[in-house]
Protein backbone atom coordinates (compact mmCIF):
# COMPACT_ATOMS: atom_id res chain seq x y z
CA UNK A 1 0.00 0.00 0.00
CA UNK A 2 1.43 3.40 -1.02
CA UNK A 3 1.05 6.51 1.10
CA UNK A 4 0.26 9.91 -0.45
CA UNK A 5 2.82 11.54 -2.77
CA UNK A 6 4.70 8.23 -2.99
CA UNK A 7 6.10 6.52 -6.07
CA UNK A 8 7.02 2.85 -6.46
CA UNK A 9 9.13 1.95 -9.49
CA UNK A 10 9.20 -1.70 -10.56
CA UNK A 11 9.72 -3.72 -13.75
CA UNK A 12 6.87 -5.17 -15.80
CA UNK A 13 8.23 -8.59 -14.96
CA UNK A 14 10.79 -9.62 -12.36
CA UNK A 15 13.73 -11.44 -13.92
CA UNK A 16 17.06 -12.40 -12.44
CA UNK A 17 18.03 -13.29 -8.91
CA UNK A 18 16.13 -10.56 -7.02
CA UNK A 19 12.76 -8.82 -7.05
CA UNK A 20 13.92 -5.21 -6.67
CA UNK A 21 11.74 -2.10 -6.50
CA UNK A 22 12.60 1.57 -5.87
CA UNK A 23 10.53 3.63 -3.42
CA UNK A 24 10.19 7.39 -3.17
CA UNK A 25 7.92 8.16 -0.22
CA UNK A 26 6.24 5.65 2.07
CA UNK A 27 4.76 2.20 1.54
CA UNK A 28 3.76 -0.89 3.45
CA UNK A 29 4.73 -4.28 1.99
CA UNK A 30 3.48 -7.83 2.65
CA UNK A 31 5.92 -10.20 1.00
CA UNK A 32 5.78 -13.96 0.52
CA UNK A 33 9.10 -15.67 1.17
CA UNK A 34 11.18 -16.74 -1.83
CA UNK A 35 14.79 -17.48 -0.86
CA UNK A 36 15.79 -17.86 -4.51
CA UNK A 37 14.43 -14.40 -5.41
CA UNK A 38 14.57 -12.02 -2.42
CA UNK A 39 12.33 -8.93 -2.48
CA UNK A 40 14.37 -5.72 -2.13
CA UNK A 41 13.06 -2.19 -1.59
CA UNK A 42 15.66 0.44 -2.51
CA UNK A 43 15.29 3.99 -1.19
CA UNK A 44 17.92 6.72 -1.21
CA UNK A 45 20.96 5.56 0.76
CA UNK A 46 19.60 2.24 1.92
CA UNK A 47 17.75 -0.89 0.96
CA UNK A 48 15.47 -3.31 2.80
CA UNK A 49 15.53 -7.00 1.93
CA UNK A 50 12.38 -8.88 2.93
CA UNK A 51 12.83 -12.33 4.35
CA UNK A 52 9.09 -13.24 4.21
CA UNK A 53 7.43 -10.48 6.13
CA UNK A 54 5.33 -7.33 6.52
CA UNK A 55 7.16 -4.04 6.89
CA UNK A 56 6.83 -0.28 6.37
CA UNK A 57 9.42 1.95 4.67
CA UNK A 58 9.31 5.75 5.03
CA UNK A 59 11.76 7.38 2.61
CA UNK A 60 10.45 10.75 1.48
CA UNK A 61 13.28 12.68 -0.24
CA UNK A 62 12.69 15.86 1.79
CA UNK A 63 12.95 14.04 5.15
CA UNK A 64 16.31 13.98 6.91
CA UNK A 65 15.63 10.47 8.20
CA UNK A 66 14.72 7.18 6.53
CA UNK A 67 12.76 4.63 8.55
CA UNK A 68 12.17 0.91 8.16
CA UNK A 69 9.69 -0.65 10.60
CA UNK A 70 9.15 -4.40 10.86
CA UNK A 71 5.59 -5.50 11.59
CA UNK A 72 6.13 -9.27 11.34
CA UNK A 73 8.75 -11.70 10.03
CA UNK A 74 12.23 -10.30 9.44
CA UNK A 75 14.02 -7.86 7.16
CA UNK A 76 17.62 -6.95 6.55
CA UNK A 77 18.31 -3.21 6.25
CA UNK A 78 21.53 -2.27 4.44
CA UNK A 79 22.97 1.25 4.50
CA UNK A 80 26.19 3.29 4.18
CA UNK A 81 26.74 2.09 0.60
CA UNK A 82 25.63 -1.41 1.66
CA UNK A 83 28.69 -1.77 3.92
CA UNK A 84 26.55 -2.09 7.08
CA UNK A 85 23.37 -4.03 7.77
CA UNK A 86 20.97 -4.84 10.57
CA UNK A 87 18.33 -7.57 10.75
CA UNK A 88 15.20 -6.21 12.40
CA UNK A 89 12.96 -8.12 14.78
CA UNK A 90 9.17 -7.59 14.85
CA UNK A 91 8.14 -4.16 16.18
CA UNK A 92 11.63 -2.69 15.69
CA UNK A 93 12.29 0.44 13.65
CA UNK A 94 15.63 1.42 12.16
CA UNK A 95 16.04 5.18 11.80
CA UNK A 96 18.82 6.27 9.44
CA UNK A 97 20.01 9.88 9.31
CA UNK A 98 20.80 10.79 5.69
CA UNK A 99 23.17 13.60 6.69
CA UNK A 100 25.25 12.02 9.44
CA UNK A 101 24.89 8.44 8.13
CA UNK A 102 24.17 7.39 11.74
CA UNK A 103 21.40 4.98 12.69
CA UNK A 104 19.52 3.88 15.77
CA UNK A 105 16.90 1.32 16.71
CA UNK A 106 13.54 2.27 18.20
CA UNK A 107 10.51 0.39 19.43
CA UNK A 108 7.74 2.61 18.00
CA UNK A 109 4.01 2.41 18.55
CA UNK A 110 3.10 0.22 15.57
CA UNK A 111 -0.39 1.77 15.43
CA UNK A 112 1.29 5.16 14.86
CA UNK A 113 3.49 3.78 12.07
CA UNK A 114 0.52 2.25 10.23
CA UNK A 115 -1.99 5.04 11.02
CA UNK A 116 -1.82 6.41 7.44
CA UNK A 117 -3.32 3.12 6.21
CA UNK A 118 -6.41 3.78 8.35
CA UNK A 119 -6.79 7.38 7.16
CA UNK A 120 -5.10 8.89 10.21
CA UNK A 121 -2.09 11.16 10.69
CA UNK A 122 -0.30 10.79 14.02
CA UNK A 123 2.22 13.40 15.10
CA UNK A 124 4.19 12.78 18.30
CA UNK A 125 6.56 15.46 19.58
CA UNK A 126 7.15 16.87 16.10
CA UNK A 127 8.20 20.32 14.99
CA UNK A 128 5.56 22.41 13.24
CA UNK A 129 7.62 22.47 10.03
CA UNK A 130 7.62 18.64 9.88
CA UNK A 131 3.89 18.48 10.62
CA UNK A 132 3.18 20.96 7.81
CA UNK A 133 5.36 18.97 5.40
CA UNK A 134 3.28 15.86 6.15
CA UNK A 135 0.03 17.78 5.76
CA UNK A 136 1.16 19.25 2.44
CA UNK A 137 1.81 15.71 1.17
CA UNK A 138 -1.74 14.72 2.02
CA UNK A 139 -3.68 17.85 1.09
CA UNK A 140 -3.45 20.35 -1.80
CA UNK A 141 -2.58 23.27 0.48
CA UNK A 142 0.54 25.15 1.53
CA UNK A 143 0.84 25.88 5.25
CA UNK A 144 2.53 29.09 6.40
CA UNK A 145 3.18 30.46 9.86
CA UNK A 146 4.98 33.62 10.92
CA UNK A 147 5.59 33.24 14.64
CA UNK A 148 9.19 32.09 14.94
CA UNK A 149 8.60 31.18 18.58
CA UNK A 150 6.45 28.27 17.33
CA UNK A 151 9.41 26.86 15.44
CA UNK A 152 11.18 25.68 18.61
CA UNK A 153 8.23 23.82 20.14
CA UNK A 154 7.12 20.26 19.44
CA UNK A 155 3.51 19.21 19.07
CA UNK A 156 1.47 16.02 19.26
CA UNK A 157 -1.91 15.37 17.68
CA UNK A 158 -4.06 12.88 15.79
CA UNK A 159 -5.87 13.93 12.60
CA UNK A 160 -8.39 11.93 10.62
CA UNK A 161 -7.86 12.31 6.87
CA UNK A 162 -11.00 10.46 5.82
CA UNK A 163 -14.48 10.60 7.31
CA UNK A 164 -15.34 8.05 9.96
CA UNK A 165 -18.23 5.65 9.24
CA UNK A 166 -20.28 7.69 11.74
CA UNK A 167 -19.76 10.86 9.64
CA UNK A 168 -20.92 9.24 6.39
CA UNK A 169 -24.40 8.26 7.59
Give the predicted meaning of each segment:
Residues 1-162, 166:
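A residue-level detector for the "anchor" residue at the start of short, highly conserved motifs
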Amino acid sequence: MLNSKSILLYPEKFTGETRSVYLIGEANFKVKPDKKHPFIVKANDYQVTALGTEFNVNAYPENSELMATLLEGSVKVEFNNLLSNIILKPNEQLVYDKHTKAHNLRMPEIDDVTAWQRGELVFSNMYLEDIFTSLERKFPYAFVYSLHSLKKNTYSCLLYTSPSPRDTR
